[in-house]
């Protein structure tokens, strides 16, 4: 699967309806979006904890300290291109309700387990109305407690633990090591892993160990064809990219 990172964010402003809708037009199998909780309990699509980047440095508000109405008054598109001046921060509801039939939606939770109440409020009526959403949405997070909470609440919905790697300058080893990572996967109850596309860490043995545990395997953020082919050949379940059309065309 080709997943559009924050929507088609290589072209359109990240985490906006403009980016998500463009991703569908470009043939993405799914989109990934980042979500924070506002002061008044709404779940909104934004990567950072503040609005500085998406406002082009003009407005610096902490999302968790601000109400939805104020957040949605901010132009979050012009920093990318003036033609997107009307872009606003969407809610989780807006993104879910625009999800085409059969497409995937990876919901990256950027805050902690305090999101579970509002998340339940958004999802329950939609899951009751459209049961197939269970197979369309996935939760992803770097916080294993969030993944664990999602798995306990919705055991039939995929929830993947996210991991990136840092090289220890003294030893030259990448951290976390595989043993530590797999321990975290186990305690998170994750159904899969979304991992940084690090060729020095992710090899066939790594993938085989995941498969033995029946875990899905996803990589981010891949924008070049050579790397995409490498991970496709390793059997990756999805590739997350800023340029879904480029990667799809390159893998044909």
Could you describe each region identified by the protein language model?
Residues 1-252:
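Phosphate-group recognition and catalysis centered on beta-loop-alpha active-site segments
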């Amino acid at each position: 699967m080709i997943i559009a990172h924050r929507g088609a964010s290589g072209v359109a402003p990240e985490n906006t309806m403009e980016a998500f809708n463009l991703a569908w037009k470009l043939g993405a199998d799914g989109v990934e979006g980042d979500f924070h909780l506002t002061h008044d309990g709404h779940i909104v699509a934004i990567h950072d904890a503040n609005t500085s980047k998406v406002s082009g440095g003009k407005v610096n508000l902490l999302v968790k300290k601000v109400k939805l109405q104020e957040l949605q008054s901010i132009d979050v598109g012009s920093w990318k291109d003036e033609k997107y001046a009307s872009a606003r921060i969407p809610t989780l509801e807006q993104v879910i309700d625009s999800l085409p039939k059969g497409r995937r939606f990876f919901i990256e939770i950027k805050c902690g387990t305090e999101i579970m109440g509002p998340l339940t409020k958004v999802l329950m009526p939609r899951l009751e109305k459209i049961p197939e959403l269970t197979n369309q949405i996935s939760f992803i997070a770097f916080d294993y407690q969030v993944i664990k909470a999602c798995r306990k609440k919705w055991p039939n919905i995929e929830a993947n633990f996210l991991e990136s790697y840092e090289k220890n300058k003294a030893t030259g080893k990448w951290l976390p090591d595989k043993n530590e990572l797999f321990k975290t996967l186990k305690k998170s109850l994750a159904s899969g892993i979304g991992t940084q596309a690090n060729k020095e860490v992710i090899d066939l043995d790594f993938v085989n160990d995941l498969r033995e545990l029946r875990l899905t395997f996803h990589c981010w953020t891949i924008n070049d064809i050579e790397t995409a082919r490498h991970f496709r050949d390793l059997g990756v379940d999805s590739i997350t990219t800023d340029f879904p059309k480029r990667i799809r065309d390159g893998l044909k």
